[in-house]
From Swiss-Prot:
Any GO MF annotation of the entry: phosphatidylinositol-4,5-bisphosphate binding
Gene source species: Mus musculus
Short motif (Clathrin box): ranges: 211-215
Annotated Gene Ontology cellular component terms: basal plasma membrane; cytoplasm; cytoplasmic side of plasma membrane; cytosol; early endosome; neurofilament; recycling endosome
Name this polypeptide is given: Low density lipoprotein receptor adapter protein 1
PROSITE patterns: PID
Domain (PID): residue spans on this chain: 41-195
Superkingdom of this protein's organism: Eukaryota
N-acetylmethionine modified-residue sites: M1
Motif ([DE]-X(1,2)-F-X-X-[FL]-X-X-X-R motif): 256-265
Biological role stated in the UniProt entry: Adapter protein (clathrin-associated sorting protein (CLASP)) required for efficient endocytosis of the LDL receptor (LDLR) in polarized cells such as hepatocytes and lymphocytes, but not in non-polarized cells (fibroblasts). May be required for LDL binding and internalization but not for receptor clustering in coated pits. May facilitate the endocytosis of LDLR and LDLR-LDL complexes from coated pits by stabilizing the interaction between the receptor and the structural components of the pits. May also be involved in the internalization of other LDLR family members.
Domain comment in the entry: The [DE]-X(1,2)-F-X-X-[FL]-X-X-X-R motif mediates interaction the AP-2 complex subunit AP2B1.
Region (Disordered), start-end ranges: 179-201, 288-308
Lineage of the organism: Eukaryota, Metazoa, Chordata, Craniata, Vertebrata
Annotated knockout phenotype: Mice are extremely sensitive to cholesterol intake. LDLR are expressed at normal levels, but are sequestered at the hepatocyte surface. LDL internalization defect is caused by the inability of the LDLR to enter the endocytic cycle.
Length: 308
């Protein structure tokens, strides 16, 4: 386990990773520029959003696919006439943790290995959406969230993509270590730097919550959060996890799910997003202090969904 943890930390500290993904070399702006701090990503970037809803999709990625899904979700949210649920979205290399902003209760915990696509919608420019494979029945779900402004939607998208890249590289290291151990077992020898019988597999690491040494999910008692919007396809919105739920289960099949989703991506190592090169450059230059600045439009954000 120590070897895998060290590998994970090394990947996070990798200068090449920082330069490729986060436009490194801007350390003079720390800590204001969140894109240059690995600690921020490891601890989890937190965004305050409003949950629009969810719909099922047929494919794991695609700009047109996600745009059509978001259009359906927004139409359903508008038709319901209900206030949107305020949620907190925490993004880290472990995945997305969704909690109710008013009650602090856990709504859903999505493994980063099940996310296949994320985007800042082009038509509804304040909407962030992601597509993930359901743990229950392996169906593909598109979840959409209303942000206060376009640049927040872009920032969330870029953060999820970066978290995915870190997790993917960690997964690769884990897979290589596992293959070395299996080869050593077959040959009856030991692999230097590994312990054949005691080093856990990727699934065990994820199940015990040790991935990249991130903090454990709060274990406070949870109760059901009422739904504030109706969902497309009559699919129930994410429910609060019960006391006995294991967020990262041993038999979750994350390794297999991640391998399958990797085949659908343009580049297996990079999460497909709907961001253009200009969007990415703009989002990389953002500071969290910019997010609180009001838009020049002056539109009331509470009713913003009805202005689409």
């Amino acid at each position: 386990m120590d070897a895998l943890k060290s590998a994970g930390r090394a990947l996070i500290r990798s200068p090449s990773l920082a330069k490729q993904s986060w436009a490194g070399g801007r350390h003079r702006k720390l800590p204001e520029n969140w894109t240059d701090t690995r600690e921020t990503l490891l601890e989890g970037m937190v965004f305050s959003l409003k949950y629009l809803g969810m719909t099922l999709v047929e494919r794991p990625k695609g700009e047109e696919l996600s745009a059509a899904a978001v259009k359906r979700i927004v139409a359903t949210a508008k038709a319901s006439g209900k206030k949107l649920q305020k949620v907190t979205l925490k993004v880290s290399p472990r995945g997305i943790i969704l909690t109710d902003s008013l009650t602090s209760q856990l709504i859903e915990n999505v493994s980063i290995y099940r996310i296949s696509y994320c985007t800042a919608d082009k038509m509804h420019d304040k909407v962030f959406a992601y597509i993930a494979q359901s743990q229950q029945n392996e169906s593909l779900e598109c979840h959409a969230f209303l942000c206060t402004k376009r640049k927040v939607a872009q920032a969330v998208t870029l953060t999820v993509a970066q978290a995915f890249k870190v997790a993917f590289e960690f997964w690769q290291v884990s897979k290589e270590e596992k293959e070395k151990r299996e080869k050593a077992n077959q040959e009856g020898g030991d692999v230097p730097g590994t312990r054949r019988d005691s080093t856990p597999s990727l699934k065990t690491l994820v199940a015990t919550g040790n991935l990249l040494d991130l903090e454990e999910v709060a274990k406070a008692p949870l109760s059901t959060v009422s739904a504030n919007t109706n969902n497309v396809d009559e699919t129930p919105r994410p429910q609060v996890l019960g006391n006995n739920s294991v967020v990262w289960e041993l038999d979750d099949g994350l390794d297999e799910a991640f391998s399958r989703l990797a085949q659908s991506r343009t580049n297996p190592q990079v999460l497909d997003t709907g961001l253009s090169a200009q969007d990415i450059h703009y989002a990389q230059c953002l500071s969290p202090t910019d997010w609180d600045k009001p838009d020049s439009s002056g539109i009331d954000q509470d009713d913003d969904v009805f202005t689409f």
